[in-house]
Amino acid sequence: MSGRGFSRGGGGGFRGGARGGRGGGRGGFQQRDMGPPDTVLEIGSFQHDVESEMLCSLTAPTKIPYFNAPIYLQNKTQIGKVDEILGPINEVYFTVKMEQGMLASSFKKEDKVYISGEKLLPIERFLPKPKVAGGKERGAQGGRGAPRGRGGAGSRGGRGGFSSRGGPGGRGGARGGAGGRGGFSSRGGGAPRGRGGFRGRGQ
């Protein structure tokens, strides 16, 4: 998954997350060869299937999964990989692209899914950085500092959490809710597709 679709304000953190996710993907292939991790942690609960993928709500509010991180059942059977991360920062959702032979429609609402603890990032990575004390004073001295200060305002884009297909919705409104300011964005900000009223996966 590319980081190019991420909103500019949250760019630094999201690009870091994407790079980590790609690394996680490679790690996942190695891990699959070596078997599942020694322990798995609960990361989400299944809400409903969307386009043959699982839409899950995040149940670990201080952690965000890597993109492409393997997702397991409690018995460590791998069922898929994290495909997209969606929704506002205080109500995060993610989709799981299923492994061959696995059907998202076979799961029941609130079924738990699990992840290796090594495939999680602290949510602080995706929050705006606090302003440095005295930064305004230095910027107020004028000259080149002032434009930089204004440029820094771009970080407002990272205020919330994740946006794109939005958060949950009913089956008809699949992934169609949240979005807009302050959200995780994924797979580009393409024009809305007709199918659930959500943003597409890129142009």
Curated annotation (Swiss-Prot):
Residues 1-28, 140-195 have a biased composition (Gly residues). Component of the small nucleolar ribonucleoprotein particles containing H/ACA-type snoRNAs (H/ACA snoRNPs). Non-catalytic component of the H/ACA small nucleolar ribonucleoprotein (H/ACA snoRNP), which catalyzes pseudouridylation of rRNA and is required for ribosome biogenesis. This involves the isomerization of uridine such that the ribose is subsequently attached to C5, instead of the normal N1. Pseudouridine ('psi') residues may serve to stabilize the conformation of rRNAs. The H/ACA snoRNP complex also mediates pseudouridylation of other types of RNAs. The H/ACA snoRNP complex mediates pseudouridylation at position 93 in U2 snRNA. This is H/ACA ribonucleoprotein complex subunit GAR1. GO terms for molecular function: box H/ACA snoRNA binding. Residues 1-38, 131-203 are annotated as: Disordered. The keyword Transmembrane helix does not apply. It is found in: Nucleus, Nucleolus.
